[in-house]
Structure formats: C-alpha cells, structure tokens
Amino acid sequence: MTIRRAVVSNRKTGFAMHLLTICLSLFLAAVTAAPLAAQEAEAAEATEAAATADTVIYDLLLKNGHVIDIQNGRNGRMDIAITGRTIHEIGENLPASRAKNVVDLTEYYVTPGLIDIHTHLDQKGAWLNLNPDHNTLRYGVTTAVDAGSSGHQGFEKFKKETIDRARVRLLAFLNIVGAGMYGDGVENDPAQMNVDAAVAMVKKYPEDIVGIKTAHYQPADWEAVDRAVKAAELSNSVLMVDFHPKEGRGYEDLILKHMKPGNIHTHFYGRLTPQLDANKKVQDYMWKARERGILFDVGHGSGSFWFRIAVPAIKQGFLPDTISTDIHKNSIMLPRAHLNNVMSKFLNIGLSLEQVIERTTVNPAKAIRRTDLGRLDKGGVADIAVLKVEQGKFAFLDSGHGKLIGDKNIRCVMTLRRGRVIWDAEGLSMPDWSTAGPYSNFR
Amino acid sequence: MSARLAVLLIGVVVTVPALGQTYDILLKGGHVIDPANEIDAVMDVAISGDKIARVAASIPGDQAKRTINAAGYIVTPGLIDLHAHVFGYGGSLWPDDTQLTTGATTVVDCGGSGWRTFDTFKETVIDRTRTRVFSFINIVGKGMVGSAAENDVDDMSPEKTAAKMAEYPDLIVGIKTAHFAHKGYTALERAVEAGRLSDNPVIIDMRITTEYDRTTQRIFEIMRPGDLRTHSYSDHQVEILNRSTRKVQPFTREARQRGILFDVGHGNGSFVFPVAADAMKDDFPPDTISTDLHNGSIFTTKSDMPNVISKFLHFGMTLPDAIEKSTVRPAKVIRKFPELGTLGEGRVADIAVFKLRKGVFGFTDAPQRRLMATKKLEAVLTIRAGRLVFDQDGLAFPEWQTAGDYEVIPIP
C-alpha cells in the first residue's frame, strides 16, 4: 500500500514556480533575440504579475471540500479562504498561491460549525456537567448551549469560571430554578422559581443567555412551566421545556396551550412523551403544535432517545426541528451520545445528510435567535466543521441500549473556531514529519 | 435528563439465568493478548462478578448470562496509563470520558496533588470516578498549580510527603517532580528522599537546558533503579539521542542497565516523531507507554493510549510488546502486579477490547507534524471491575427491532 503524503503546499513552492516562469521567459526572450528594451519590459511585467499572484491574503485555504451551507443554498465542491478570524472568500477555484496553507478536503464535507442546543457544560457546577471544550469541538460543535445547569443564583459563577474561559462558544438557557439543576430538593420547589430574578439575569447577559429552561419538575401542577413561559416572555427570550406528564397535567395541554410559538420541547423522542398512539401513529396534537410554532428538539441523553419511537415517527414524516445531545457525564459513556453519534443515528434512520446538517446548523441558530450562526458568509466568523461520512458497518445504542446497525458514520475530522484549526484529527493541515527535517528544539 | 428514571429501571428487566449459567459475561472469540500470562491467541474470557473466572480456548456460550461476540477484535487487560492528569493541574480531564473510552481502566495522576491537597483529590476525583485512579504525589505540597508553587523549594518536604503516602499506601504509588525552573537538582533530591522514606518510585519531568545548569548524566546519577524518566521522546527533556549522530547516548543505555525506567508521557510537547523514530531504530523502546493526556494534548496530539500505541506500532514495535508496556510493565512499576495488568484467573476483571484498523491514518506529534501510518488501534469496549462501561459498537446489546417493547436493557 502506498502512503499518501499530506497534500499541503505553501507559498514558497508557489514563489519558486513563479521564479522559474520568470527565468524561462527571460531565456526564451534571449534566444528569440528580441531587442533589449523589450526584454526588460517583459521581465518587469512578469515580475509584477508574479508579485500580484503571490500576494498572500489567506491564512488557510480549505480546498475542494463538499460544502453544505443550507442558509446560503450552497451544496457542492467549493473552496473556502480564511484570513484571521473570518471567512475571506467562498467560491470555486480560489488561487492556492494566495494561501499560507492549503488543505485538500476532496474526501470530506465542509459545513458551518455545528450547534448543539442541549448540553450540560457548567463543569464547576453540578456533578453531571462535562468539560465544555473536548466534548464539543472534537465533534465539530463550535456553539453549545448549556440547558439550565445554572439558575440566576449560579449563572455569574458559571460565566466567570467556564463560559469566559471556554474555547467553544458557550451560551446558556437559564434555569427558572434559582439554584439551577441541583436535584429534586430545589427543582421541585416553586419558591425557587423567581421570575423577576431570572428575567433580570437574562437581560443583564444578553450575549450569553439565549433563554429560559424548565426541567424535572415533578409536582402535578403547571407552576414551573407557567413561570418559565412568563420569564421567557418578559425577557423576550427562548424557552426550552423538559416535561414529565402527570395526571391532570397532560402533554397535549403543554404544547397546545401553555407553551408559546418558538418555545422548544426537548426530549420529544423520549418514553415520557406521549408522541405516538398505541399503533405507533404520531398523535394529531404533535402536528398541531408544530403548526403553531412549537419546536421539537432531540436532547438524546441517557433516557430520551428510543429507536422504537424515533423510527416510526420519522417514517411518518415527524422529524426533529433540532438535533442535540443533552451531553453529560452519564450519556457520554453509554450510549455515547456525542453530536456525531446522534447525527449518525438520524442519517442511518433515513434522513439525508443535508437534513441532518440543517438540523445542526441553521435550525438551531434560528431556534436560539442567533441567525448569525450556523452559516458560512464572506466576512463572517470562520467557525467551520469538516466531516467525513464513513461507509462500513457501524452500531449505535439508544437510551434503552437497543442497537441500530447502520452503514454510515459521521466523524468530525477538523474543526475551526474563529479561523483557528482547533481540532485536526489526522493532521490534514500539517506538513509531513519525514520531510520537515530534523526539527530539534521546535519551540 | 431522564437519567434517574433510566437508572431505576435498570434491573427491572433481568435476564433469568438458566441452570448452569455460571458466568456473568463471556467475551467470545476475541484475540487475547495477555503478556503477563504469555497468551497471544484466540481465546474466550469468562467473568463472574468483578473477577476473571476463566480464560480458555472454548467456553460454551450457554454457561454465561451474557455473551459478547468479540471475534475479529483484540482483547487485553485494561490498560494502565502511568502519566495522566485528572486533578490539580489546570488542564486536568475527567478520566471516565477520556480514559475508559480509550481502553485505560487505571490511570495514575502524575503530580496533580501534593500532600496538602491529596485529601481533596481523593474526595472529589478518586472516590467518584469509575476509572481506577492512583496518584504519583507531587513533591510540592500544593501540587501542580503553577510555577510559583512548583518552584517553591520550601514547600518540598520529603517527610510530609512520605507521611501522606503512609496514610494512603493503596492509592499513592510514587512521587512526581516536575517543571522545576531553578538551577540545580533540589526538587529531584527532595523527591528521591521522599521515595527513599516511603520506599516508592519517583517519576521525573525535568528540563536540562543550560539555563538551569543541569545535565542528563547528573540526573541519572541521582535517580535510583526503579525511578522513571517521563517525556522520554521529547527533545528538551532527556538526551536519549546524540543530536549529531542520532544514536542513543552511551550514558542513557547505562542508566537503563542500572534500572532507570523510561516512560513515554506523550502530552502536548513531549513526543517528537524524529526522536522516537531514531530511538526505535537504535533499539531504545520505552519501558512504559503513557499519555500525559490533558486538555491541551487531547486537541493537539490526540495522544490517548491507543493513539500512542499506534505510533509505536508504526515505528516497529509489535502489538504484544506495546500491550506489555501498557499493562504488566506499568503494573510492576506501581507494584500492583499481579492484581492489575493481567487477565489471570481470579484477578479483577478490568478488560479492554480493541479494533486494529488497516487503512491510511494520520497521526500528529508535539510540533504539529503529520505521520501517515497504515495501522490504527481503536478502543471499542471497556469492562471495569466486571461492569461494562463503554461499548462503541454495541457488542453487548441486541438490535432494537428484536428487543420488542424494550425497557432499558440492563448493562452487564
């Protein structure tokens, strides 16, 4: 087997090529015995042309990847040039000679940095939270939204200790429970749910907080949901609901009466949600709720994604609006639900790659009202994911540990955050060591 | 997060054991590599409770409650990562989602805590992880918390360090000294003194640049047999190689002969392809393979255990050799052999299952260069103390269509 060398060129080789061109043209000019003045003029012209072509503008050129950028209608082979933190140019055949570093992505898909709107990354907070960077950026996620790990009492600590230090763009749904996601004691206590305090916190940090979260509330009344709805309304932000139906507190009422258009119900393929009837038919109220603008989010986690629910629902056309992980200390082990895993499940169930990318870029961006994200724009921030769709035999576990065997697997090979290659699984952007010389004292 | 309900439901559906089912889990048909017992063959591994019950050529499936078909996979003792960062140091990682998912069931935190902070380390990490966590305690009382603390020779007390080690002899397996940025050898001498007082090995990370007025030879002289040099394939730590001839230095070989051990400690800055390639070419493999995995290296070099092993496979090490240097050898270093690092019958059932993929794969080193290799080891399943903790290919579970109206299918 031959080993393919890294396809990386740099401006030195480009410059050398141009020098060669200049020499050749000088030589040709000499042998044709052109007048001296003409020779000089030609040489000057050639030098000028070389200088223009060699003006290095791009820090990085992502070459020949299959770009899927739903928002801008891009779906095909294209180059993306990056300068500093931003996308300088997107188009066909951008000149490699203008780039400091060229990466050949012929085998890969290139998408906007993925967005995971249901995560638990307040790592200095409650036990189940994870490190914000390595369970996001390694899977192409450049924007993660923490879903209510902290409430108004703990948010500023979360911001100072984690959000402001993370390399991933970390946003938050603020828990309506002041203490945050710290167990039944506080999460079932309406006295913890101070609407005014939550609203004030959302308004104080509009760059970080995208909305309100309510979750895990067990008493059979509407206190938690209604207060969260009110807080979201008063702060003009998004609401995400995790809901356990009870006698006298039904799911249909939640999505048709209590929640407002634009609110998100997460965990909707979970067992606690009566989304299917006894014959596995999608309930009418699901369609009605979707029509009135309720959004349905996956939020896979340890308990909320079941093939026996998702497969029939998807066959009937009830797809998720947004694909997210609910990633935390348990779900990352078994069933190993990081975003590439969850995306791969939907791909193998039958969604197209475009549908999967739409639900991990544009749709979540709209859901959290950050329409500047999830897209690739000239002049926009260079948050980019490079994905490989592997072919073979792959297995995926759901929350009940039922297994789906599929033939496709999405694997993130490269992630750019603010123009910087922060994850490069196989060194695509790096020069080959064996040609790099004896690089002693590399620092 | 409906995890709580899921947890409650585990155990509701219990596979009723038929008569004669003596084992809880049977790993069937995998290629077992167990250097401690000189096994390198297709074998079945049976587990009862948290122990290895039997390793044999053919154990009938009906003797087990749960059979995992491991045909085509490689089965090894759970790997032991001698150099990890899971406490104290700013780039520390949670070991379960970084190590158990990559085949390491035991990690040794390399100097994150000192005698002042070990109790906190124990309460917040060691007692709460599913990964087995040991400590190389830092000779610095405050631990690896930045240069001000790490250069404070007044906080390097061999006596207090040894006293803490005597308090937790089952958890603290040695002493670390690292990042000492003053002239001379004080940190090393204190660490070795603590090692002498506690009768435990010392692991050393110490630069040799002239600014610190240190030489590799003198460092080797202070070290005792059984002590370890980590970051061996860096080019600013140990002078394994002569830089002009690119051959192994005679004094390095002498040190090995004396019993000084050479650990990988890959990390962010301490593994350079040309150094490793030349050292391997001149027959100087590491004694122990370890990662120095932290929040930086997990991005730059991706150097978890299977990644580091794959790099050595490319430079000519055999897989059984690499497994030995990741199981029985580190177990001996921390004096936990034969409890750990073996699939011996009656030993704890810490087991890793790997796939050895063939193809073309890119790997990266500290200076961010790329190596193209044709083999890649990848962790697919991990068992820790008899319990399945990671199963990427769902080997232990049925297909969802055949599971009926399944409740949570119990984790074996």
What kind of feature is each model-predicted range?
Chain B
Residues 22-25, 32-76:
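Histidine-rich, glycine-flanked metal-binding segment
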Residues 274-358:
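His/Asp/Glu-enriched, well-ordered alpha-helical/loop segment
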Residues 70, 96-179:
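Divalent-metal coordination cores built from histidine and acidic residues
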Residues 1-7:
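Bacterial N-terminal signal peptides that target proteins for export
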Residues 73-96:
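Di-metal (Zn2+ and/or Mg2+/Mn2+) metal-binding site signature of metallo-dependent hydrolases
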Residues 174-278, 282-299:
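Active-site core of metal-dependent hydrolases
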Residues 30, 348-402:
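C-terminal cap of metal-dependent C-N hydrolases
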